[in-house]
Regions:
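Hydrophobic alpha-helical and helix-loop surface patches within well-folded domains
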Residues: 133, 266, 299-548, 678, ...
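Glycine/proline-rich low-complexity spacer/linker segments in large multi-domain proteins
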Residues: 73-86, 172, 179-234, 285, ...
Length: 922
């Protein structure tokens, strides 16, 4: 046997065993995996897997030399184990020319990338998605000669969006220029995205913006699309001359020139990561309609300027540094990825009109603006070394956005809202096991895209807030400043920088290790529960703090209070300690412990029974407001979730929240409303749990509404308005008679003179729905002209009308809508928009009636016995029946859903009120 054959066999055998081992653990990576145009589909059995792998490896072994076998085997291993590109090839500079064919929704690209190769190779891998590559040329200058090599083969790894370019010769270490010619698409999954808008004179126009997803740039040009890789960019954009397009970029626009049929724009950037690039193209005559920040006249312009000035002052930046190009674009698919010196808002997210929008919208818009502006601090600053580290930058931007809005607009109480709306929601989602840990592996495209979800924007800032309060303001701010001066950074870099600042400014004998403290908080799906035990004697009280798991280090800095006075110095309950014990002198007054001051720690607190009773007694005293408002909210949220997880008896939860009848602050009420949402699934059922829940909650809502009133006044505090809206919503959901009477009164008042007695927009749906529930007002009275149905713009209004409990009125409107629908089809064929609007509202109406009345005997009877006459033709019989079943909670009513004839017959049987079997019979 000659040496070449022996090497082939050895390589073949070892590679086969190696790939088979990987196959068992990484099957999904082989889906549609392409090498040299050979397709490997996902096998179904072990034998099939072995045969197909054998086939591909035999081909590699039979057609390659020793070096190329080794090269290909390395390539396979990299693809299986690591989604990253090889680290021995790096881009230094990109020169890109893009020519848009806007009528055909395509663009042509030429990309010249200056790269450095540090290790001999025969192929180059880079990212590319939805691009049709037509030519690849690699050049290298050696002395006076330019060596040119064309790619002999191009392979795609679709799951990783990687293109592999194979060359005839081995590429030695050195500097190269990689030139690629390609074609892309202007579409939602393309390099450019088209967004429609209506300009000032009513014309429909198109705005074109670069794909705003984290990995959207690989759809615009082939590139090394990893966050830790930075390069300079020179981008030339050619747009049709006759389209009057204007180009804005997040970088320096050197100049533009016109040479029919194109207008050319030249853009350069400093060293940045690919995901920070942004380009917006639109008709220059519609500049103000696209809402650039300098032309905004609504409140948001002032807010953005105020937020920007505050951030610049806090971070000691030159005035005007952050107030650059900021655009609010209607319909923009915004995933929250920040661009360099370029803020793209989704206009719907930040528009606020005080005449039609509830105050909660203004607060939420403020939060988004704050995060976007602070995100600009990371323009040319530190980039994460890998996608899994992106949560750090996003968490910092979100948290400091909250801090900035809280400082700029203190009346928004943005920090208080952050705790109850963001941090507590994060704890709830952790309970549900629906969030991955912050520090998660990223091995696929879907995992990269999923990173930019609510996990980053609720858990990341919550964990960083805990670190902030553990190390203190000065250390936290200085540590972040130092970290941002780095070019790229990993989590270890961040912990190292923060530790360095902490050590230099802290004199404590028992210093904390920042990395050890924080690692488990970002690596685990859940959070710890801190158990608090008090042991009393005649003069002293012993306090024992412990966690169920020994793995957690729980920061308790400034978190332990007795009688609202801090009793413990800075310390952590470390993983080495089973418990922490301290003692305090008994006072004559009521004693109670508050752990986790202002809920700065990301954990729940479980007190023993006597401690719960002491806290409850104090909350039910006239001094309840002495407990910090965030701790009042924390106690409610903790007790509810301990109760539903069977760690606490529910009667304790109701004892704790019994004080709410005196509480007029929206913040502690917020977790109570969230608890009501969680328990709402039991409301349709007529059982003991449902009755107790309704009774207990109404016992708090009744006195509250008597205290704050049912009517909204213009001079009411923002949070009183929010509290009243939620309190009345839940009071009516729970069938409170006073709530329904007030709604009927407001509805009749409005209908007496709709022009003069106008309802506030955010009360309109509530008033109509709850007013119609109890009034004798007929729906025919509301629609004297049924053509008005086609002019209803918001589906929510159809939902409100479906609240009517008058059986005759509902049936009458159904009949008239059915007739009018047929009239529309025959009479309005030229007015398609009007007809479509009517049919759409009719469909909404049908579904909303089912949702509201499927459990009502009389209306359910009408639905079932007039099914074909009532059902819109656009809804299938199957879909309609399933919808009725989904909203029917009575076994008796379900049994009545027995026979509906369309093209098929449906026989539905209910077994033990739990199992539903549907037989389809022709």
């Amino acid at each position: 046997m000659n040496i070449i054959k022996l090497i082939k066999l050895l390589l073949y055998g070892s590679l086969l065993n190696y790939v088979m081992a990987l196959y068992q653990h990484k099957e999904n990576v082989f889906d549609k995996f392409k090498i040299n145009n050979e397709q490997i589909t996902k096998p179904k059995t072990t034998r099939t897997r072995r045969s197909e792998i054998t086939k591909i490896i035999k081909e590699i072994a039979s057609n390659a030399t020793h070096s190329s076998i080794h090269q290909m085997s390395v390539t396979v291993r990299v693809r299986l184990l690591n989604p990253r590109l090889p680290d021995f090839i790096k881009p230094k500079k990109y020169e890109i020319e893009l020519t848009l064919e806007t009528e055909e929704d395509i663009f042509y690209g030429e990309c010249r990338i200056m790269i450095i190769i540090r290790k001999a190779t025969q192929n180059i891998s880079l990212h590319s998605a939805n691009l049709e590559i037509t030519e690849v040329i690699l050049t290298r200058k050696i002395d006076k000669y330019i060596i040119v090599d064309k790619a002999r083969n191009i392979s795609y790894i679709y799951e990783l969006q990687i293109v592999v370019l194979y060359f005839s010769e081995i590429l030695r270490p050195g500097n190269y220029t990689l030139s690629i010619t390609y074609k892309g698409v202007i579409a939602n999954d393309g390099g450019f995205v088209k967004v429609s808008y209506i300009n000032a004179i009513g014309e429909k126009k198109w705005l074109i913006v670069t794909n705003n997803s984290a990995i959207g740039m690989r759809r615009l040009f082939p590139c090394w699309d990893e966050p830790g890789l930075k390069a300079e960019f020179v981008i030339v954009v050619n747009v049709p001359y006759n389209e009057s397009y204007n180009v804005f970029s997040n970088s320096f626009l050197l100049f533009s020139s016109t040479s029919k049929p194109l207008t050319t724009y030249y853009i350069v950037t400093p060293e940045i990561s690919t995901y920070r690039i942004g380009i917006v193209i639109f008709d220059k005559h519609d500049y103000t309609d696209i809402s650039p920040i300098q032309n905004l006249k609504l409140w948001r312009r002032e807010l953005i300027e105020d937020v920007t000035c505050t951030v610049e002052h806090t971070w000691q930046l030159q005035k005007g540094y952050l107030l650059r190009k900021q655009f609010a674009i209607t319909g923009l698919p915004d995933d929250g990825v920040d661009k360099l010196a370029f803020v793209l808002y989704r206009e719907e997210d930040i528009i606020y009109n005080e005449k039609i929008d509830p105050i909660a919208r203004k607060i939420e818009s403020s939060r988004k603006i704050g995060r976007k502006v602070v995100g600009q601090l990371f323009d040319t600053a530190v980039s994460p070394s890998w996608w899994s580290c992106m949560w750090l930058n996003e968490g910092i931007a979100t948290l400091f956005g909250v801090y900035t809005i809280n400082q700029t607009m203190p009346d928004t109480r943005m920090l208080d809202l952050f705790v109850v709306q963001t941090q507590q929601e994060s704890l709830r989602l952790d309970d549900s096991q629906v969030m991955n840990p912050l520090d998660s592996e990223v091995n696929s495209i879907s995992e990269i895209n999923s990173l930019f979800s609510f996990t980053y924007y609720i858990k990341a800032p919550s964990i960083l807030r805990m670190l902030h309060h553990t190390v203190g303001d000065e250390i936290f701010q200085k540590g972040i400043n130092m970290y941002m001066k780095r070019k790229t950074g990993s989590l270890d870099d961040f912990w190292t920088v923060m530790q360095s600042v902490y050590d230099s400014q802290t004199m404590d004998l028992e210093k904390i290790n920042v990395k050890d403290l924080m690692n488990l908080w970002i690596q685990e799906k859940q959070y710890p529960i801190l158990n608090v035990t008090e042991i009393f004697d005649s003069e002293w009280t012993k306090i024992v703090l412990e966690t169920a798991s020994e793995n957690w280090t729980v920061p308790l800095t400034h978190h332990v209070y007795i009688n609202l006075k801090r009793i413990l110095p800075t310390f952590c309950l470390s993983r080495e300690q089973k418990h922490f014990l301290t003692t305090c002198y008994n006072s004559e007054h009521s004693r109670f412990i508050i752990i986790n001051r202002q809920q700065t720690g990301y954990y729940r607190v479980y007190y023993h029974l006597e401690s719960w009773l002491r806290i409850t007694n104090y909350l039910n005293s006239k001094n309840y407001s002495n407990i910090n408002v965030l701790n009042r909210a924390q106690i409610i949220d903790d007790t509810f979730h301990l109760a539903i997880s069977s760690k606490l008896n529910f009667y304790l939860f109701w004892d704790v929240v019994s004080y709410l009848k005196w509480e007029t602050d929206y913040i502690p009420w917020y977790p109570m409303f969230k608890a009501a949402e969680y328990m709402s699934h039991i409301l349709p059922f007529d059982n003991v749990d449902s009755k107790v829940f309704k009774m207990k909650l109404l016992m708090q809502l009744g006195p509250l509404l008597q205290k704050i009133g049912y009517e909204e006044e213009s001079n009411d505090d923002t949070f009183i308005k929010c509290l009243r809206q939620e309190a009345l919503r839940w009071a009516c959901i729970l069938d409170d008679s006073e709530c329904k009477k007030h709604a009927e009164y407001k509805l009749r008042w409005h209908l007496l003179n709709p022009i003069k007695n106008q309802l506030l927009p955010w009360w309109r749906e509530w008033t109509f729905c709850n007013g119609l529930c109890v009034s004798s007002i007929s729906l025919d009275q509301l629609f004297i002209d049924l053509n008005e149905v086609s002019r209803i713009e918001y589906p929510e209004m159809m939902n409100s009308l479906a609240c009517c409990n008058n059986t005759y009125s509902l049936r009458s409107l159904f009949d008239k809508l059915k007739k009018l629908r047929n009239d529309y089809i025959f009479s309005y064929t030229k007015d398609n928009a009007r007809m479509i609007s009517f049919i759409k509202n009719y469909i909404y109406w049908f579904y909303y009636v089912i949702q509201r009345h499927a459990n009502d005997d009389s209306i359910n009877y009408i639905l079932l016995n007039n099914f074909e006459e009532i059902k819109p033709k656009e809804i299938s019989t199957t879909a309609a029946v399933i919808n009725i079943i989904n909203y029917t909670y009575s076994g008796k009513l379900l049994c009545e859903v027995s026979f509906i004839k369309h093209n098929n017959s449906f026989h539905i049987f209910l077994l033990n009120y739990n199992t539903l079997i549907i037989f389809y019979m022709s």
